Amino acid sequence: MLCKIFIRTFPSTEECELFESILQTRWSILIKDVPGVTFDAYRTKQTPNISTVVWQFHDAESKKKIEKLIDDNIKKFTATLSPKTMSFSGERTLHFKS
């Protein structure tokens, strides 16, 4: 299992909400073309201007396809809203489930 995590800090809660509404409308359509991929978005009440997105992939090819879709469809919005962005990509090394 592979993952990619984006943590974006926006100047305001409103900009974060706007960005998440863009993600909701775009990804609900775009993700259909890449089966077996999981997208989750998280926010907390304590820091509502921070959006965390976690992608999970079963293989490197799916990850590559999503990264291209991000470049083609999402980067223009992050360039306009200009959040501070941190990202992480990696392979799962441990997994526990109860």
Regions found by a protein language model. Name each.
Residues 1-72, 79, 85-98:
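Short S/T/G/P-rich N-terminal loop/turn motif that feeds into the first structured element of a domain
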